[in-house]
Amino acid sequence: MSQMIDLTVPSTVPGRTLHAFRCVPEGEVKAVLQLSHGMVEFIDRYKPLAEYLAGRGILVTGHDHLGHGGSIRTKADYGYFAEPDGNRAVLADLHAMTVRTKELYPGVPYFLLGHSMGSFYARQYLCEYGHELDGAIIMGTGFQPKALVQFAKTLCRVLAVFHGWQYRSKFVANMSFMGYNKGLEGRTTHDWLNRDQAEVDKYLADERCTFTFTLNAYYSMFSGILRLHDPAFLAKMPKGLPLLFLAGDADPVGEQGKGVRRAIQSLKDAGVQNIECKLYPGARHELLVETNHQEVFEDIGSWLEKHLA
C-alpha cells in the first residue's frame, strides 16, 4: 500500500504557504514525478494518478500553485499569484519543491509533469532547470499566437492602472477562453474539458475550480507564455532530455493537435531532439479524468519506466 502524505510547505514568497502532497510507494522508490497542475484547479485532483503510479514504484509529489486550492490565506487569494513578479514566484516554488524532494530521495531519477497552465510553467522550467531532470511530460499544452498574448499582457497592465492587480476582469477571462466550448454549447460552459459529463459537473460544483483569475495572475501567465516564443530562451533547454507530449485531439487548448505540434516544432527548432507525442482520439482537455484516463495513466507509467533504464 502506498502512503499518501498531505503537507504544508513554505512558498518562496514571504508569508505564503503551499498545500502539497507526497504519495510514497511501498518498497523501493524507482523514480519521482513532480506535478505542475493547471489553471483554476488544485493538486488533490491528481491523487488517483499518484496512487496508480505509486503502485508501480514511482513516488509522486506536487503542490497547489499560489492562488489555488489550499495555497490561499483567504478566498480573496484565489486566482492571485504574487507581486511584483508572479511568474517568477510560481517557477521558484516549483524549483523549491524539486530541491526539497531531491534532498529526501537523492540519486533517484526525477521527472516533471505539467498540465495545461502547468505545462507552460513546465516548459519554462525545462529551460531554466532542465539539467536537474531526467525527463518531462507536457500534457494539455498549446501554442498561442505571440501577438495575441502580447496584446493580452498589455491589456492587463493597462487595466491594472485603473483597477489594481487584484481586479478580476470578465473581459480578459472571456478572451482567454474564447471559442473553447464551440460546438458543445447547450449543456455547460465547460464541456470542452471532458467527455465525461459527471466529471465536468463535479468540476463546476467545486469552488476551487470556479474562481476568476486576477489581473496579476493573467499578467504573470502571459509573461511566461511569451518567454516560450523566444528562441534564445528555448535554446537553454537540454537538447537530449526525454520529453513526452500528451493531448486529446479534441482539446481546444491545443487546437485539436495543431498547437501541440507547433509547440513541439518550436523545441525542435531550438535543437531539442528526444520528443515523443501521443494524441488521444476524441479526448478533450483533462486527460487524467477523461473517459480513457486509465489508458493515459498506463501510458505515463510505461514511459517513465522506459526512461529508468
Q: What do these predicted ranges mean?
A:
Residues 1-27:
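N-terminal cap/lid segment of alpha/beta-hydrolase-fold proteins
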Residues 36-41, 116-117, 249-250:
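Active-site glycine-rich loops that stabilize anionic/oxyanionic intermediates
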Residues 48-76:
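Conserved alpha/beta-hydrolase
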Residues 82-102:
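Alpha/beta-hydrolase active-site loop
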Residues 105-116:
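Alpha/beta-hydrolase fold nucleophile elbow
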Residues 122-208:
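Alpha/beta-hydrolase-fold enzymes
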Residues 245-247:
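Short beta-strand/loop motif that positions the catalytic acidic residue
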Residues 270-309:
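Catalytic active-site module of serine/aspartate enzymes centered on a nucleophile-bearing elbow/loop
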